[in-house]
Curated annotation (Swiss-Prot):
Name of the protein this chain belongs to: Histone H3-like centromeric protein CSE4
One Gene Ontology MF term: protein heterodimerization activity
Assigned keywords, A-Z: Centromere, Chromosome, DNA-binding, Nucleosome core, Nucleus, Ubl conjugation
An annotated GO BP: rRNA transcription
Coiled coil (residue ranges): none
Parts of the chain that traverse the membrane: none
Biased composition (Basic and acidic residues): 77-99
Family: Belongs to the histone H3 family.
Species name: Eremothecium gossypii (strain ATCC 10895 / CBS 109.51 / FGSC 9923 / NRRL Y-1056)
Length: 204
């Protein structure tokens, strides 16, 4: 009997010890549960406040808020659509294209001279500016007239003189260039112009 009583007491003590340990674990679990409950209550309170605000806000204000929220989203969607269209419109570049630095195109001096000759042969415009030519004509005529007898020029008369003088100069330079080429030279020299004037019958 004594042995059975001692074994029962030992079992009871062990059970109490286990219960105490379980109580301690349960206390930590209970603390966590309380924290979670408090957080949930706070969230519910916040949600209720937001719902109360939306209830008491008039419909016009709600629409304004919705429009303010919707406008940036619509603008972003439009911008995205425009970017996609631009990308689709661009021609697709090959992936393995290497950018090669282009060298500036350089012409020889002879090519540039030939281009200028062709351009001036096609054009019919006057090469000498009008005002300096008119001043030169007036200076020359003033040398042969007195102060009382100054000559006056019409604009068409000065223009006719300019046309004639430019035609003469162009013809003389053309013959001078031909004589330089005949002498197996490219550079025009003074003696070429003298010979051209002598052949024409115009002595220096």
């Amino acid at each position: 009997m004594e042995q059975s009583m001692s074994s029962e007491q030992a079992e009871r003590v062990a059970g109490r010890v286990e219960q105490l340990g379980g109580f301690q674990n349960n206390e930590s679990i209970n603390q966590r549960a309380l924290l979670l409950l408090q957080r949930n209550r706070q969230r519910r309170q916040l949600l209720q406040r937001q719902e109360d605000r939306t209830r008491y806000i008039p419909d016009d204000a709600k629409r304004r808020v919705v429009e303010r929220v919707a406008e940036p989203a619509a603008a972003e969607s439009r911008a995205d659509g425009a970017r996609e269209e631009e990308r689709a419109a661009r021609p697709a570049r090959p992936r393995e294209t290497r950018r090669i630095a282009k060298k500036p195109q350089r012409y020889r001096p002879s090519d540039v001279a030939l281009q200028e000759i062709r351009r001036y042969q096609r054009s019919t415009e006057l090469l000498i500016s009008r005002m300096p030519f008119a001043r030169l004509v007036k200076e020359v005529t003033d040398q042969f007239t007195t102060v009382d007898q100054q000559m006056r020029w019409q604009s068409m008369a000065i223009l006719a003189l300019q046309e004639a003088s430019e035609a003469y100069i162009v013809g003389l330079l053309e013959h001078t260039n031909l004589l330089a080429l005949h002498a197996k030279r490219v550079t025009v020299m003074r003696k070429d112009m003298q010979l051209a004037r002598r052949i024409r019958g115009q002595f220096i």
